Regions:
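A short, flexible beta-alpha/helix-coil linker loop
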Residues: 1-4, 175, 231-234
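Midchain, well-structured core segments that form catalytic/ion-binding scaffolds
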Residues: 1-143
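His/Asp/Glu-rich mid-to-C-terminal helical/loop segments that flank catalytic regions of hydrolases
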Residues: 9-27, 96-103, 111, 151-159, ...
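Structural signal for hydrophobic packing residues in well-ordered secondary-structure cores
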Residues: 22-29, 61-72, 106, 161-165, ...
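A structural micro-motif
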Residues: 29, 51, 76, 166, ...
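Short glycine/threonine-rich loop-to-helix capping motif typified by GTGT followed
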Residues: 41-48, 178-191, 214-218
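Zn-dependent metallopeptidase/amidohydrolase metal-coordination segment
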Residues: 114, 121-136, 141, 193, ...
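Substrate-recognition/cap regions that form aromatic- and gly/pro-loop-enriched pockets
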Residues: 119-208
């Protein structure tokens, strides 16, 4: 799912779930490979880990599934199969560090808005966790509508990097698009919508990054409204939108422009 819009829906993160699973194994093991998630702003729905062990893990997996899968997670599948013998694997310390990181990283809602009930203020998502070239890589997305809170989350990740002797790279930073209590553009669009459809539109705030935030930082007095067609299951393999609603958005936008 979308790491912003869907972050408060309680969906499991496959990467952090793998950490919980590995920490519960009662046999000694070393990690050979790890591959979970593909993008920082997507809640990962799959994670695969190859381990080297002399122990039997089937019973542990069954017990883990019994204790961790709820009625809301019926689509979750945990499978194990024998892999080919590996030539290389992580040492004991590196294996333990990877498991501790996956187990300890808080992925999800970090704070709710105090001014807008039900709106997520701050969140972080572990979108990618993999081992490549002998190195463990983790890619996260950090969001907040409050700049100091976003910095606090980044400082926490920076502290983790120091703790594990890791290199930290920050990229793709974008400013928050703060809600304007008084918006002439929003009022005009509400008026046009009412004329077209005979009812008021639903105006919502969302926990997601939008281009309006970037423009708002550069343009003094910037007033903006984001609109689009009906969409479902964003950032999933089942992502889709209503074509008919796209047509309605087009006509609505044309009428708004005529009024400006």
């Amino acid at each position: 799912g979308h790491s912003g819009i869907d972050i408060n829906k309680g969906r499991l993160n496959a990467d952090t779930l793998m950490g919980r699973l590995l920490s519960g194994l009662n046999s000694e093991f070393r990690i050979v490979t790890l591959c979970g998630g593909f993008k920082d702003n997507v809640i990962p729905n799959a994670c695969e880990c190859v381990i080297a062990t002399n122990g039997e893990i089937s019973n542990c997996l069954a017990e883990f599934a019994k204790n961790n899968i709820t009625d809301g997670d019926k689509g979750l599948k945990i499978t194990a199969e024998k892999a080919e013998k590996a030539d290389k694997c992580l040492n004991d310390k590196s294996t333990a560090d990877v498991v501790k990181f996956l187990l300890g990283f808080k992925s999800g809602v970090m704070a709710m808005s105090q001014s807008m009930p039900g709106l997520v203020e701050s969140s972080q998502n572990l979108g990618v966790a993999n081992i490549s070239g002998g190195y463990f890589n983790a890619v996260m997305s950090v969001r907040s509508s409050v700049k100091p809170e976003k910095q606090r989350l980044l400082d926490g990740i920076r502290s983790l990097a120091v703790q594990y002797g890791a290199e930290l790279n920050i990229h793709g930073d974008y400013p928050a698009w703060e809600y304007r209590e008084n918006s002439r553009l929003r009022d005009k669009m509400t008026e046009v919508y009412g004329k077209m459809y005979g009812k008021k539109p639903t105006v919502e705030t969302v926990h997601a990054g939008l281009e309006c935030g970037l423009l708002g930082e550069k343009i003094a007095g910037f007033d903006a409204v984001s609109l689009g067609p009906d969409m479902w299951d964003i950032h999933t393999a089942n992502e889709h939108l209503s074509v008919s609603s796209a047509g309605r958005v087009y006509e609505f936008l044309r009428n708004v422009l005529k009024e400006l």
